[in-house]
Regions:
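Short, Lys/Arg-enriched N-terminal segments with co-localized hydrophobic residues
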Residues: 1-2
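Bacterial N-terminal signal peptides
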Residues: 8-20
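Von Willebrand factor
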Residues: 25-89, 107, 117-118, 132-138
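Solvent-exposed loop/turn segments at secondary-structure junctions
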Residues: 35-39, 75-80, 95, 108-111, ...
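Short beta-strand-loop
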Residues: 42, 67-104, 119-128, 145-150, ...
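Residue-level signal for alpha-helix termini/capping positions
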Residues: 61-64, 126, 156-157
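VWA/integrin I-like adhesion module and closely mimicked acidic/polar interface patches used
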Residues: 105-106, 140-185
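Conserved donor sugar-nucleotide recognition element shared by glycan-biosynthetic enzymes
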Residues: 114
Length: 185
């Protein structure tokens, strides 16, 4: 199928999931970072936002500097808003430091409009004739009344050479399934 999906769920070690996934090999990529208020929660005594930032840094430092990658975030500017989605760093080669700096400066305070954020990232990448990859890093499920499963099916049907990767952590089994269908479709 045109949309290939990889689901990596990790209960505790986000970095191992991200570092093991060959998600940044070719084409353009956008990492969609969950900056919602729930990222202040903890796993084994560590804030989830700290784990996500560390994993992001590890992935970026291990990739080819010529890889075109960008960063989109949600929940980082407004508390309680489903519209708080921003392309913070447009996909380009050599953006690793800009992405790291943006993630390190980010506030974590809003809701989780993950479906709309992935839709916008896919739209941003749609103009490319290369393979396009969206990597969603999240600790939660959709909180803005959208359906990640329907979005996955819609993106699959759109005909874009598109891959979605979902890295979920700190999720219950039910929450994991709700997010996984985005990538599985």
């Amino acid at each position: 199928p045109i949309m290939r999906a990889l689901l990596r769920l990790s209960a505790f070690i986000l970095c191992q999931s991200l570092c093991a996934a060959p998600v940044l090999a070719e084409g353009k990529s956008i990492i969609v970072l969950d900056a919602s208020g729930s990222m202040w929660g903890q796993i084994e005594g560590r804030a989830k936002l700290e784990i996500a930032r560390e994993a992001l840094g590890t992935v970026l430092s291990s990739m080819d500097p010529e890889t075109e990658i960008g960063l989109m975030a949600y929940g980082h500017r407004e508390k309680g808003s489903c519209e708080d989605i921003e392309l913070v760093v447009p996909p380009a080669a050599g953006t690793a430091q800009a992405i790291t700096d943006a993630a390190n400066a980010m506030q974590f305070l809003g809701k989780t409009p993950l479906s709309e954020a992935v839709r916008r990232a896919a739209a941003e990448l749609k103009s490319t004739e290369e393979k396009a990859t969206v990597i969603l890093i999240t600790d939660g499920i959709e909180t803005c009344e959208a359906d990640p499963c329907a979005l996955g099916a819609e993106l699959e049907a759109s005909g874009v050479d598109f891959t979605a990767h979902v890295v979920g952590f700190g999720l219950t089994e039910e929450e994991g399934k709700a997010v996984a269908c985005l990538a599985e479709n």
